[in-house]
Amino acid sequence: MQYTRNTTMTKTDRDTLRSLHGRKKWEHIWAYYKLPIAIVLIVVYILGYAAYRHVTKKEDVLYLGLVNITAGSDLTEQLTTGFAEAQGLTKKQQVDLLSGLLFSESERAEEQYVYASEMKLLGAVSAQRLDVVLMDEYARDRLLADDYFLDLRTLDASFHALSGLNAGGTVLDISDAPFVRQAGFSGKVYLGVVQNAPHPERAAAYIHYLFQR
C-alpha cells in the first residue's frame, strides 16, 4: 500500500507558523509547499521565456550567403542593415547573413573546412534558408556547374539590361556596384539567386539596392 504525504497544514501547524518569524517562517512554509511553489516558478519561467522569445524574435526577410568573400564591418553593415533600412523594414525584420563559406582550389586549404562549407551551403539551400549568394570567380564556376542559380531575368524584366549579366542570365558581375567597389576586392565579385529562394521578390529588390548609388 502506498502512502502520500499530507501537505495540508493542521491547526497545530498553523499555530506554529504564526509563532515563527523571518527566515524560520519561510523555511516552515517551504517544508509544506515546496512542490507547488516549484511548479509555479517553473510555469512562470516558461511563460516569461516564451514571452521574451516572442518579443525579441527576428523575422528573416532575406538570406544572404558569402562564398570565398570576406566582408569587413562597413561592407557587412551596408549589405545587411543598410538594405533593411532602405526597404523601410521594422526593427524585428533583418537580413540573415551566412558568412565564412570557403570553396578553394588551393591545395593548402583545409579540406575539412572546405567540406564543412559545402555542406553548410547545401543545407541552407535544402532548408530554403538562402536567397542571394555573393561569391568570387572560383565559387561562381563551381555553383554554376551544379545549376544552383535561377535566371535573374525572371525576377525583373529590367534585369535584361544589366551589363554584368552572363549569357544564361544566372550570374551577375557586381564588381562595379558602389558598395562592392569601395570595399576594394582584388578580384571580381558575382551575385546569384538560388533556384528555390524563399524570398525572390526581396532578392530582386536587393539587386536594385546594390546598384542604386
Which residue ranges define each predicted feature?
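Extracytoplasmic/periplasmic/luminal assembly and interaction segments
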Residues: 78-137
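A bilobed periplasmic-binding-protein/Venus flytrap-type ligand-binding module shared by bacterial periplasmic
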Residues: 186-199
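N-terminal Lys/Arg-rich, disordered targeting/topogenic segments
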Residues: 1-27
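Solvent-exposed loop/turn segments at secondary-structure junctions
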Residues: 69-73, 138-142, 197-198
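Hydrophobic membrane-insertion alpha-helices, especially the h-region
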Residues: 34-53
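Short, well-ordered beta-strand elements
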Residues: 60-70, 95-99
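Extracytoplasmic "Venus flytrap"/periplasmic binding protein-like
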Residues: 113-168
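Short amphipathic alpha-helical coupling segments at ligand-binding clamshell hinges
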Residues: 198-209
